[in-house]
């Protein structure tokens, strides 16, 4: 009986500790969401939202499609995930979503640019497809994204030809469907590696099956479910640019932009955010930047003014992650805790910093420490 009582006391104490620790906020930055974005097709430009419904892999519909470049040789067919860091012309494609109709749309704005390989193509420069298309009869292929693999559905010739005509190469549009990708390294907060470096309260929670969260997985998001950036840091990047050039925050491809941080780049140390309404988000990794931040949206090429120098100027003093020491850091990758069914982010929503790390996190996704440092 004494042993049972002791066990019950320990259990109650652990649960009380979890709730008390989760209720404690860092007394610092109190902010608001000012911008929200979703990117239905990986690598293409995103779509601004007023409210962002949350699903199991981030914003609903975020990066559930991607383009696979087809390589054919004597050994057969090989597929390569198209990434904007190596294919800046992908910025000529602008996406939008209509959640009420369940549709994603893509508009190509490449007419008259150096990438206008579509001369003579008479099909409309806008195409739409369901956010959750039927996969009946679709062929499956393996997608390899940063060595994290998933089985995906090829959506057929009509959609793929539309993109191929405008990219000038053979591509396939694929849909993640019921598939998902593993999170590598210790970036997923509820993976074994993530829990080893998590705060004590999260490690204690994982010991109880009825409280533990499952390990996170991904669609075609690079590294995490969400990317959070601040207006203060973006303004600091603008201050580095000459000739009154301004940094467009969308080139950092965030899901959530917040305003009200105490300074530029203070988010490097943020470990957890608490949003009004009860949502909590673990921030587990820095986002180190590729060449996509240098693109000119009007040309699909590196900007010829000082905006084209953004990566180099950041690289002078923003190589602050020992795990990705050749690239500048801007923004934090995050995952929401617990059930997010039917929950939403909204512009104007309050945000508080719930935990500040003593040191910057170290990026440890295998074989991904030099991505985007050069152009292919």
Label each PLM-derived region with a short phrase:
Residues 1-376:
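Metal-cofactor-dependent catalytic cores
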